[in-house]
Amino acid sequence: FYKHAEKTFSFEVMEAALNDYITDLDSLDARLQMRLSYPARVRSLRSGLDGFQYYDIALELVETGGARRKFMHLDYVYSSTCPCSLELSEHARSARGQLATPHSQRSVARLSVEVMPGDCLWFEDLIELARRAVPTETQVMVKREDEQAFAELNAANPIFVEDAARLFCEQLLGDPRIGDFRVIASHQESLHSHDAVSVLTEGETFASDSIDPKLFHTLIHGR
């Protein structure tokens, strides 16, 4: 592994390292997963400022029976406003003149996708697919005008967790570079004492009758 340490990180470098492991260990099957925090410059909504958003990403290579497959995993952090709560807040204002605010919360979508052989899918591509699906990504640089713009964006895109999962799936299904995938959407409720979670899969790769009991705890992003 260390002889590849100075190379620019890519699936190709991972493949070279995996080949070395297979040769050195005389192994039939092998798996290599690399996790990283990827910095991407993101512009604020209204003030024109920008800063770095850090994305939890993992690349994975799996070889079984002589067949090699590539996977990418992304945690996309966004804000979700409850559609029901939004309507109730508006009703309180219009019916009783009572100021009310809808509940919203930090939410996380973990997108796990298979990259089709011969195709190029990179971090920015998967991040952009997530943004297209649910545009209320948490912000990096925030002035008052950005906070107002974010409030407007959330009000224009209220969403239940099931609908968020469907929107992510819609984007992934529409990209020919992506094969099997799994979407886990977790809305970490500010109203309820439990989180709302939705899981959708496409294909057999991520389908399972059992889920790791610690999986959902890893979706907490305290940043």
PLM segments and residue spans:
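N-terminal intrinsically disordered, cationic/polar leader segments
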Residues: 1-223
